Swiss-Prot record:
InterPro entries, sorted: Carboh/pur_kinase_PfkB_CS, LacC, PfkB_dom, Ribokinase-like, Tagatose/fructose_Pkinase
GO biological process, one term: lactose catabolic process via tagatose-6-phosphate
Listed transmembrane segments: none
Catalytic activity: D-tagatofuranose 6-phosphate + ATP = D-tagatofuranose 1,6-bisphosphate + ADP + H(+)
Name of the gene encoding the protein in the UniProt record: lacC
CDD domains: FruK_PfkB_like
A Gene Ontology molecular function term of the record: phosphofructokinase activity
Source organism: Staphylococcus aureus (strain NCTC 8325 / PS 47)
Keywords recorded for this protein, A-Z: ATP-binding, Kinase, Lactose metabolism, Nucleotide-binding, Transferase
Taxonomic lineage: Bacteria, Bacillati, Bacillota, Bacilli, Bacillales
Keyword Isomerase attributed: no
Protein name as it appears in the record: Tagatose-6-phosphate kinase
Length: 310
């Protein structure tokens, strides 16, 4: 069983408009409302590829119950921790080929709720074999909250796949308890190291070999349409992917995390892990719906990906 954590989930609302009129009424004919958050995208893709998955995190109020019901309808198991605050909305206005987003901050977690979730998590940890942590921390939690979770996973021998950025990731990396996998992109690497980077092999090798990343088994760097670069222990890989028609890239990173987590759970070899992860990321990009993959195209894309030891 895989446990996914989305500590700051949202109800994602999409408003498609022919044109956005400012300071005027905009009428929307089709509204899409989904259970949102990076970790829930990971959850949906894991469920689609047939992995046993359990979703957890903080939810509160009517919007929190909406998320739970959406997962129920998709037959996805969940064990959320209920809080006093209201789960947030995240609104995307799609207009003239552009996307304008309005993101609520979300609820503030108090000390009692923060401690309560850790105890809740410790109980869930007893019955899972891998943990995928995605997205930002809600207001009120200390920057080392993910580090506290990772410490408990490491004490139980449970691998952790972590997808976050900024100060939260920096805090984790400076902690003695390390995740099994991190998945930064080039700009996130730059923020962490505060040094110039490019996509050359030497630059990437030097970056991921910095002392900051010591103790992390897998570092997988997304290069967008150029594929990926990875370091597994002391081995480096370059991943070349085919050119595809991209319909909606949002959620592709989360689908990649789902592939990594699935491969870690099933003890797949390095090449298959990298190919599975990138295949699911590309499949998501070919769909309008975020966190959805059409597995009919899986084998074709998987076989076109090239993984080279460099």
């Amino acid at each position: 069983m895989i446990l996914t954590l989305t500590l700051n989930p949202s109800v994602d609302i999409s408003y498609p408009l022919t044109a956005l009129k400012l300071d005027d009424v905009n009428r929307v004919q089709e509204v899409s409302k989904t259970a949102g958050g990076k970790g829930l995208n990971v959850t949906r893709v894991l469920a689609q590829v047939g992995e046993p998955v359990l979703a957890s995190g903080f939810i509160g109020g009517e919007l929190g119950q909406f998320i739970a019901k959406k997962l129920d309808h998709a037959d996805i198991k969940h064990a959320f921790y209920n809080i006093k605050g209201e789960t947030r909305n995240c609104i995307a206005i799609l207009h003239e080929g552009q996307q304008t987003e309005i993101l609520e901050q979300g609820p503030e977690i108090d000390n009692q709720e923060a401690a309560g979730f850790i105890k809740h998590f410790e109980q869930l940890l007893e019955k899972v074999e891998a943990v995928a942590i995605s997205g930002s921390l809600p207001k009120g939690l200390n920057q080392d909250y993910y580090a506290q979770i990772i410490e408990r996973c490491q004490n139980k021998g449970v691998p952790v796949i972590l997808d976050c950025s900024g100060a939260t990731l920096q805090t984790v990396l400076e902690n003695p308890y390390k995740p099994t996998v991190i998945k930064p992109n080039i700009s996130e690497l730059y923020q962490l190291l505060n040094q110039p980077l490019d996509e050359s092999l030497e630059s990437l090798k030097q970056a991921v070999s910095q002392p900051l990343f010591e103790g992390i088994e897998w570092i997988i760097v997304s290069l967008g349409a150029q594929g990926a670069f990875a370091k597994h222990n002391h081995t480096f890989y370059r991943v070349n992917i085919p050119t595809i028609s991209v319909l909606n890239p949002v959620g592709s990173g989360d689908s990649t995390v789902a592939g990594i987590t699935s491969a870690i759970l099933n003890h797949e070899n390095d090449h298959d892990l990298l190919k599975k992860a990138n295949t699911l990321g590309m499949l998501n990009a070919q769909e309008a719906q975020t966190g959805y993959v059409n597995l009919n195209n899986y084998d074709d894309l998987f076989n076109q990906i090239e993984v080279l030891e460099v």
